[in-house]
């Protein structure tokens, strides 16, 4: 018998983004696809958090990102030392963000308390795995 456990909490529904208002006094890094940078959707998400937190945006995301993009993301992250990472985008964005968070914790000993994925496409499943 095989057993698989993925300790992922999933929030879905029209008000699920409101959970972001629960963050207080955090350094939040939002990693998103470049086309979202000036979108009303991203403005809305930032508005849920920016009055109580320091929010920084990183958009150097490419499809099927090579490890060099993960390294660049870690280098960017070192300057802001986020306590929360939010990935907004498709599978490539979410996977790259998970790599940045993982190596930031393991190699740079950053205190990243929360990783949140907000998928903008369906089908990848990247938001439900920790790897």
Label for each model-derived stretch:
Residues 68-131:
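Glycine/threonine-rich beta-strand-loop-alpha-helix active-site module
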């Amino acid at each position: 018998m095989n057993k698989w456990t993925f300790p992922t909490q999933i929030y879905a529904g029209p008000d699920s983004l409101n959970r972001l208002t629960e963050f207080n006094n955090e350094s939040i890094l939002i990693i998103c696809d470049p086309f979202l940078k000036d979108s009303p959707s991203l403005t809305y998400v930032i508005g849920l958090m920016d009055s109580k937190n320091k929010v920084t945006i990183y958009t150097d995301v490419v499809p099927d990102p090579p490890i060099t993009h993960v390294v660049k993301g870690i280098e960017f992250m070192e300057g802001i030392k986020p306590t929360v990472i939010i990935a907004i985008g498709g599978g490539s964005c979410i996977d790259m963000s998970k790599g940045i968070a993982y190596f930031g914790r393991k190699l740079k000993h950053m205190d990243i308390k929360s990783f949140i994925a907000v998928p903008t496409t369906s089908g990848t499943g990247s938001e439900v795995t920790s790897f």
